[in-house]
């Protein structure tokens, strides 16, 4: 038999179990997004971009590396961060770029060089590698559903 007090004591555990599970769920969701955005470099298209592949280079003979993969730094810089209060941000971490940029010493990355508002280049986003992904959103929903199922 279970007493009323035993039942109340059992429910005291649930909030901490939920908080712990939510933290782990956010980590999993962040890892899923990072994995999907890094995969866009192999697929040569942004996730969920209606099947549109990145445009080819205008001069293929000039470069001897994969499209969007001169050093691999941009792909390797994709990361995520948890914020207090429930937030999760996916971003490119400029600290993961090599010390000297190959285009211009003031910028460590090709993306930063082309998207700098003070530079001579206008913003020029030609090959999107991060964005909404219905597949990852579905995975995130499943992760949260499993979390709720585990505490009920």
Language model features with spans:
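Short, Lys/Arg-rich flexible segments
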Residues: 1-152
